[in-house]
UniProtKB/Swiss-Prot annotation:
Residues 287-296 have a biased composition (Basic and acidic residues). Its main location: cytoplasm. This is Ribonuclease HII. InterPro entries: RNase_HII, RNase_HII/HIII, RNase_HII/HIII_dom, RNaseH-like_sf, RNaseH_sf. It catalyses: Endonucleolytic cleavage to 5'-phosphomonoester.
Amino acid sequence: MGASTTARLGPARVRSERRSCAAERHRLVDLYRYERRLARLGLEPVAGVDEAGRGACAGPLVVAAVILGSDRRNRIAGLADSKQLTPAARESIYNEIISRALAWSVVVIPSSEVDELGVHAANITGMRRAVAGLAVRPAYVLTDGFSIAGLNAPGLAVCKGDEAVACIAAASVVAKVTRDRLMVELHEKFPMYEFATHKGYVTAGHRAALARHGPCPEHRRSFVTVRRAGGRMELRITELADSDDSPGFASGPAEAVPGPAGSAGAASAAARPAAAGPAGRLVDQNRAADLRDNGDVSRPAELLEIP
């Protein structure tokens, strides 16, 4: 900023804007640190994967995979977890991602398939499809929160990865914007539910519309809110838990998760719970198993620990 800018805005305002610009530069440097670290290990390109619509009771589940690259000249200003952005900012950053990413892929899983597979299995299936759909094959895959086997590339889960990793944040934006646009289209078809407002998530207005009109074909019958509105109340084990109940683990075979032919360990890896941890730290419980499941035992997971 030159002397004319200082005179126009005042010294205090100029200092504040300089601090803000410096903070944003540091934030972006930190956001891209996983891609830089993996590039130094010879693991490029890196794909990030995330979904939108997991907790909605209507509409599709949308999964995106994005490869950004580690070149600092190609960093996307303002990139962040989609939940931290305004709708206008998401649209702007979405356009930047689509035009500047090395590769991107989107998978839309309709509500009927979510009901058939279950939300978690549908999410895993969508992530596999999204990575397989990339025009550039990734050397490494980073996922948000839990690991995915059967990706034909080594990968790791990152706690709160959509906040800590650039390519996962980009995937979250692409998935969210894509799904929001689809929900606006569904609003035109089913205006009585106001899908354009709540995007299929449970709100007081959505509950009232369900009570008044019943569910439409885009509602997920596997969700208790929809089953109540439709007059069907099959009780599930998960609905017996009280608010103070803690998670437990069952013995026996893991639930089968659809995946590519020949992808060993898909069910067991999908059943592994993700460990809690601070944002931007790799999930300790899954790290070594991820490398083993994805066929890369030559690179210890500890190489990717980033302070």
